[in-house]
């Protein structure tokens, strides 16, 4: 690849997290029974007219602001994109072809060489989704729950140069969508769907190579696989002196290859025209300024805040990649006020526990999170040790019992009375006079030995902090 340069552009469709659809009052949900969240507008019944969902427009403007874009708020208009397919009841899709809601923005990434790189975003525009199509055998099943769901399409310039850069761009975009409450950005639910355009040109050439589009990639890992395969495929053609044809392809995750769909000659003429049933929306500068008083969430600012709390980079990226986990982390840390301890017990231990049970953090109640917070406080106060905390955490999850009750039930109550601990020390020291005589020469080794002895004697029920402080007093007399 030293003699060639890869050119990648990306188009992302993100489903907005609004309560209702884009042009009707039907509800939105990924989990409902098929064809139960529909009305006459979604089915394009005669005589129905679309009404623009105000929240969709607000989210579009808010995303444009978060992506540093110029907004077309003074003239928000819609267009018809014509094509005929089973998933499109009207025979056209309502979109924004001529006046996209946001233009000329960017996302910054740290590239593979640790350099800050700006990826330009050409535009974002609002549009409605189509019905969901499922093929089973020779049958085609359509779920119109998705028809009319509001989407934003995000179109980048061809600034990406590798699969890795593309993944970094998508991960950063996903965080912006999550933390600005635009979308849940769950690729597994179809809330984030990705098309990539890949071409290759000789190093130093100014003209782009022949572009190949790969449609509807359903996971970030598959985006990387699709790009890497397509680079190899095109490079092999070039090295064999064969032409790269302009095509639309899809990614087959069974074979990890891209598969031909159609050529440029088969390209559809969408016959865009203005949507006459929706009057243009004119928003004043003052109106939009008031909207933007709620500042868009900067992912880099969040990174800095988490770093100041002492979290390492991998922990920060885990939290920023999972909105519900970040929310749970903030909730628990507000009670505990120890970010490192909360991260260990909530984001590592507890997440590992619920993953084994195929549950996600969104299903965990505030009541259970409060109990986990109380458990972490007990650990931080050294009233339970690490081994005991792991056992209690699992019991909290399985039984929903309070940690204090579990401590009693499991026999984990600590000995904290100084007089009782002093008696135990005298008993231990009397049996270990030879070790006691070595204290002045090797204090650390002797202290470690005696702490081990009291833990053995009490089956780890002596409070370690109190025990150590009492031991120091005795040894220094």
Swiss-Prot record:
- Record keywords: ATP-binding, Ligase, Nucleotide-binding, Protein biosynthesis
Tell me if Transmembrane is a UniProt keyword of this record: no
Stated family: Belongs to the GatB/GatE family. GatB subfamily.
Q: Which SUPFAM superfamilies does this chain map to?
A: GatB/YqeY motif (SSF89095), Glutamine synthetase/guanido kinase (SSF55931)
- PROSITE patterns from the entry? GATB
EC number(s) of the enzyme?
A: 6.3.5.-
What's the protein here called?
Answer: Aspartyl/glutamyl-tRNA(Asn/Gln) amidotransferase subunit B
Spell out the subunit comment: Heterotrimer of A, B and C subunits.
Which PANTHER family would you find in this protein's record?
A: GLUTAMYL-TRNA GLN AMIDOTRANSFERASE SUBUNIT B MITOCHONDRIAL AND PROKARYOTIC PET112-RELATED, GLUTAMYL-TRNA(GLN) AMIDOTRANSFERASE SUBUNIT B, MITOCHONDRIAL
């Amino acid at each position: 690849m030293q003699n060639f340069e890869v050119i990648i552009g990306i188009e992302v469709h993100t489903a907005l997290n609004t309560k209702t659809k884009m042009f009707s009052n039907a509800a939105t949900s990924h989990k409902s029974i098929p064809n139960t969240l529909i009305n006459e507008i979604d089915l394009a019944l005669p005589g129905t007219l679309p009404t623009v969902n105000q929240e969709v427009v607000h989210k579009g403007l808010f995303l444009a602001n978060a992506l540093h874009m110029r907004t077309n708020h003074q003239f928000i208009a819609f267009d018809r994109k014509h094509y005929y397919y089973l998933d499109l009841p009207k025979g056209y899709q309502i979109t924004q072809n001529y006046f996209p809601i946001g233009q000329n923005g960017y996302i910054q990434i740290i590239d593979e060489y640790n350099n800050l790189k700006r990826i330009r975003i050409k535009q974002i525009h609002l549009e409605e989704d189509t019905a969901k199509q499922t093929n089973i055998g020779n049958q085609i099943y359509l779920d119109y729950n998705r028809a009319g769901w509001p989407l934003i399409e995000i179109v980048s310039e061809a600034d990406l140069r590798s699969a890795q850069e593309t993944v970094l761009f998508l991960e950063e975009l996903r965080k912006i969508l999550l933390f600005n409450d635009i979308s849940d950005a769950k690729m597994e639910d179809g809330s984030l769907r990705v098309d990539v355009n890949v071409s290759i040109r000789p190093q130093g050439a100014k003209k782009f190579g022949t572009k190949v589009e790969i449609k509807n990639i359903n996971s970030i890992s598959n985006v990387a696989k699709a790009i890497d395969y397509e680079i190899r495929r095109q490079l092999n053609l070039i090295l064999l002196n064969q032409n790269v044809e302009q095509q639309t392809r899809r990614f087959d995750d069974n074979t990890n290859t891209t598969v031909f769909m159609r050529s440029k000659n088969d390209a559809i003429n969408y016959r865009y025209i203005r949507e006459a049933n929706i009057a243009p929306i004119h928003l004043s500068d003052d109106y939009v300024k008031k909207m933007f008083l709620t500042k868009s969430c900067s992912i880099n600012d969040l990174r800095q805040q988490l770093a100041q709390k002492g979290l390492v980079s991998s922990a920060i990226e885990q939290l920023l990649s999972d909105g519900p986990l970040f929310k749970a982390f903030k909730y628990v840390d507000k009670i505990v006020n120890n970010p490192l301890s909360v991260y260990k017990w909530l984001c590592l231990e507890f997440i590992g526990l619920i993953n084994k049970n195929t549950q996600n953090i969104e299903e965990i109640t505030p009541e259970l999170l409060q109990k986990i917070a109380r458990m972490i406080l007990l650990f931080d106060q050294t009233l339970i040790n690490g081994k005991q905390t792991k056992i209690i955490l699992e019991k909290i999850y399985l039984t929903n019992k309070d940690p204090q009750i579990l401590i009693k039930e499991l026999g984990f109550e600590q000995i904290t009375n100084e007089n009782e601990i002093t008696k135990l020390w005298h008993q231990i020291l009397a049996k270990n006079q030879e070790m006691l005589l070595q204290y002045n020469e090797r204090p650390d080794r002797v202290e470690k030995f005696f702490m081990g002895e009291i833990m053995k004697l009490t089956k780890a029920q002596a409070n370690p902090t109190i025990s150590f402080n009492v031991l120091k007093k005795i040894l220094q007399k």
